[in-house]
Amino acid sequence: MRTITLEEHFASPEFFDGPARFVKERAEKVGGRYAQVMDRLCDLGAKRLGEMDAAGIDMQVLSLSAPGVEQMEPADAIAMARDTNDYLADAVKKHPTRFAGLAAVPTGAPNQAVEELERRVRHEGFKGLVINGHNRGRYLDDRF
């Protein structure tokens, strides 16, 4: 029986210059665990695969770490979603039996979110998407 873990997180180096810059700033000040977290989230290669093997994990279904792209202005979120999805798609192509992807989409730009999801699912084999429960401070179930 295969062991598949769901919604395992990843990040790209660019993600730590954008929505997760607070983690990078903290890592630069104190190092330690913050630097380790950044390194581990960005690793979609030998180190992660080794940890998966050691834990008996055959496959990870990966999604972008919090805070996602939902806190960004729509134009920035569109670019960050594409970049982080490209980063994930590259890892899935290199290790298709070990990684599967869930897309990040710019929910503040609905048309582009649909385009990004279609591109990732139809053309790159992503399994779906992850939508965080809020967009720039507004929860999905807030009254409009």
Where do the PLM segments sit?
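Helix-coil boundary/capping segments in enzymes
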Residues: M1-F144
